[in-house]
Structure formats: C-alpha cells, structure tokens
C-alpha cells in the first residue's frame, strides 16, 4: 500500500512539473518570441535542393539497416508496405505582412545582473579554414574570451514576420553548420553477422592531427541525402499498445560479485539531469516510471554505475566532475579555467566508485543527450590533457590536476551516445541560450542553492551563501557574477556554435569503439516542415515544432530537442552505418538506424504519460546495448589471447 502511494505521488508530481514547464515555456515563447527565433537579418543566397529522390537514392535508402530490439513478443514489419510518395506540392503564394518589432521589455529577476545588453550567444561565422583544421592556433583561439555581438532590431522584425505568415520558403542548407555533414555521408558496410574487429587501414596507433583528416573541399550543390533529412521509409515498429508498468524506485541493488562484464558500464546523464543524492526522493532518471535501469542491469549480472554531475554546468566542468566521481577526490576545475571565467576553482568532494580506474582498467561510457559531449571531452583530457592548464602551471607554478596532464590512454573501451547533440541544437541557439531563459534558469538555480532545496551543481559560481554573509552582500555578489552572460555553461555548449568548438577540440581515438543511437518523433507536413508526432512528451512539443520549422531542411527531423543530423555523429568525423549484426569497427562512429517514434525522453523512460513504449521495450533497448558491449569484450579478449 505504501509503495503504491509512493508510485502515485511520484507520477502526479512528475506530471505537475511537466505541466508547469509547458506553461512557463509557452508564456516565454509568446512574450519573448522575437528573441527566441534567432535568424540572420541579412539575405543569404540559398542553394535549392532537389526534394524528389532519384531511383539510386531510393535503392540506397531501402538498403539501410533497421534497428532490431529484442522484445518478449517480437513484432514483424511488413516490408511490402512502402510509404506512398506525396504529389508535388504547389508553392504557396507569398504574402507580405509588415510586423513591428516586439515592444515587450524583458523583465529581469531580482537577483539578476542589472543590465544585460550583450547576449552570450553570437551570430559569428566560423571560417571554413578554422573548421577544416584543428591546429594549435585554433585551439588557442577558442581558449580566449569572444566578445558578444549585438543583434539588430531588424532580426526581430524578420523573425516575427516569419511567425505571423504562412509563407513557404524554399528548402535551404546552412553552409556554416551543414556543408560538412553533406560531404561526410555514411558508409554502408555489408552486414555479414561477423563479430571480427575491422579496423580502418588508414587508422594508425599514434594520434594524428585532425587537420590531416578533414575534407577541405568547398560545399557544392547536391541533392538532399534522404537518410540525413527525413525519417527513412522503413523502420522497425517501436510502438506498443501496452500501457507502461509504473514502478517506484526500489532500494539500490548492489553490483554482482562476479559480473559478466570485465569493464564496468558508466551511465552519464544530460542537461538538467539529477542522479544520486542530488535527485529528489523517489526520482529515477535512468528508466523513469518504467524501470530502474541500474538495478535491472545489475540483477542481470552487469557492473553498472550512474554518474552524478552538474545539471547546468558546461561540458568542461561536467567532464572534470565525471573524472572525480569515478576516481574520488575534490573536484579541481583548473586554475586557468576558473580564472578565465570568474568562478571558484574547487568544487564538491566525491568518494569515488572506481578508485582503481587507470590505464589498463577501462570502462564503457553510455551518455544520454549532453552526457555524450561530456564523455567525449573527458576522453580528450585523459589523452591530451588541457593545454591551457599545463601552460598556466608552467608559468605560475602550483598544483595541476592529474586529469589535465594527459597521457592516460586505454582508460575507455567504448563510447555510446543516445540522442546526443554532437553538432548542437536550435533549441539552445534560439530559445535556451537567450538572455531571458538564462536569467530565469540561473535565478531559479541560485535561489534553490540558497534555500537548499535543489542542487543544480552550480555552487562554484558562488550560488551558495557564505557563512556570516548578509543577504544584501549575497545578492550584490550574485548580481555581479559573470554567470549571467558567460559561455562557460551548458546552455552555450548545446548551441551549434558551442558544439562546434567541442568538435574542433576533440577527435576520434583509434582504440575506442564509438556508437550512436538517434530518435525522430516528428513528421513532415505538406509545407515541408516537421511537426511533433502524437504522443511526444508534451514538454518537448514546443521545441520539436520549432526545430521542425528552421530554415535548414537538414535539421528539421528531430526528437523534440535534438535534430536527427546532430545526433548521428560529429559533423567532421568518420562514420559508418551499421545495425545490430554488423561487424565491430574501432575509431569511427557506428551509426545505428534512426528509431522512428522515439522522442528525447523515451530513451530514458522519463515520460510518465507515455503509452507508446512499454517497460519491456525500454529494458530490451538497454539489453541490446549490453549485448553490443559484451561483443566488444569478447572480440578484445580474442585479439589479446
């Protein structure tokens, strides 16, 4: 009886939080719509794309492997049922509507900095020469502060005009962010069911600079690659008519004494994720109301951990926290980093769940959403260290964290990302990282830290009131904090510009297995835009519809927060299309088929109202990942025998 009451309490609270989120987001979207729809004010020449498929493209699309999840009751897909192509759509007549710029004034929370005239995001074009190479100069350039650029009022007028009219613009491609993805199409290997490791002959043991691997060719006019723009015609049926089995978060199950996996599984949550002691009582991030995935995998015989890192911080800070979560010790964000961005150098102290984690004792990382970016940056620091921290220590002396020294390869066996915005998301570009949303979110996080209600992991920004500090002094110190317009935040790292900086900094490790899982929960309309599927988690509908209407057609299919093209792989890194039976590949992104009907929350079961995906379907999805990781261990043990 007590357990049932606990279950209902958690579900009601979850629904209430979701409803509140929708109302707040909707109000912000209506009031600050001019700010939320950031587009270039200058007219750009767009390259028309052929929407119709050629017969060759059609054949290629149908040969793409399909995701297969091991379910208790297998469902068969009728391959004979092809999607009926829509007739050519006549272009809607263009209507000119004059809209005055929004006259709304942004109200700043009481604890916010007095005036924010310069937003943290910038409308700055990254030179192609910079994108084409990751030289030492470009690395140093990204270390420096970049001055914000003011957006003109004409931007707002154009954005509001776009919202008020039904004008259909020709499909276009953003040359800054999409041309590399067009030129870097997936390779489709033959799937023969073998598990032998296939290492690219071009891959060498020593890591080579990324500028030797990037195609520097200029973008050229191409037909839209069907596999990258819209959901494929054939998908494994992921929906289920069964209602989800609601389960309360039980007591933690201990790891097995003799686990099946030699290398532990480490799950890393994304933005606004709460795990462990910082989670609300009864909250279960990995599995939601459907299953406790950690306990489920431990009962199945796997050594499994759920990392707990900051919910709002930047990938740098989250990567550092992930390191100390595993190794133990007091978090050191770095002397150079903390001085540059204006926050405290040291954070919380972790006990350490894998204190013996070192070269030769690797782990498997599985990251959802922003967690995938965090993992990639941590792996980079393990191998190469942080050049800025090394230079600072050489100049000023003092202590430097072992993480920033580098030289720690062979600590990661595999990296698996789920719905990760490797190339950023328009949801952060045009909504999340706008001044209004930043101020509301950080003010709430600051108040929660002050009251001790919710730990957003931002105490290094001084959100916690000091002993003996008056309330007046505390409010003044918070108002003068650099957090309000800083780029050292999760919201900035999730923008396309912030993600591009991470992509330029990191590179593939030839000794690691990489894999990505992607969902799409939108469908194309007669006007060529994408709207949310029926049943999408309702807090994602607003952003899902917004992303589905952006100018760049390649970015429209999405899972409610992340575009399909962003989740598949970093834009400038090697990739290959695979399915569950494909042979294993090191040093390249193994891209699984897009999972139709899966939104951003479905992958972690965090939609209490979802009836499309059952608990068994969710657990089977993670069992398929576990099977893949065990195949890797078997292949590695055979190779080393």
UniProtKB/Swiss-Prot annotation:
Q: Which residue ranges have biased composition labelled Polar residues?
A: 95-106, 127-139, 227-239
What Enzyme Commission number(s) does the record list for this chain?
3.1.1.3, 3.1.1.32
Tell me what reaction this enzyme catalyses.
a triacylglycerol + H2O = a diacylglycerol + a fatty acid + H(+); a 1,2-diacyl-sn-glycero-3-phosphocholine + H2O = a 2-acyl-sn-glycero-3-phosphocholine + a fatty acid + H(+)
User: Region (Disordered): which ranges?
Assistant: 41-174, 206-246
Annotated Low complexity bias: 53-64
The molecular function terms of the Gene Ontology recorded here are: calcium ion binding; phospholipase A1 activity; phospholipase activity; triacylglycerol lipase activity
InterPro entries in alphabetical order:
AB_hydrolase_fold, Lip-like_C, YSIRK_signal_dom
Q: Which ranges are annotated Basic and acidic residues under compositional bias?
A: 73-94, 140-165
The signal peptide, as residue positions, is 1-38
What keywords sit in the KW lines?
A: Calcium, Hydrolase, Lipid degradation, Lipid metabolism, Metal-binding, Secreted, Signal
Q: Which GO terms describe its cellular component?
A: extracellular region
Q: Does the keyword Metal-binding apply?
A: yes
Cell location: Secreted
With respect to pH, the record says:
Optimum pH around 9.
Q: Where is the active site?
A: 369 (nucleophile), 559 (charge relay system), 600 (charge relay system)
**One GO process term, biological-process aspect:** triglyceride catabolic process
Entry keyword Translocase: no
What family is this? Belongs to the AB hydrolase superfamily. Lipase family.
Q: Could you tell me which NCBIfam families the record lists for this protein?
A: lipase_YSIRK_Sa, YSIRK_signal
Q: What name goes with this protein? A: Lipase
Annotated organism of origin = Staphylococcus hyicus
Q: Which gene encodes it?
A: lip
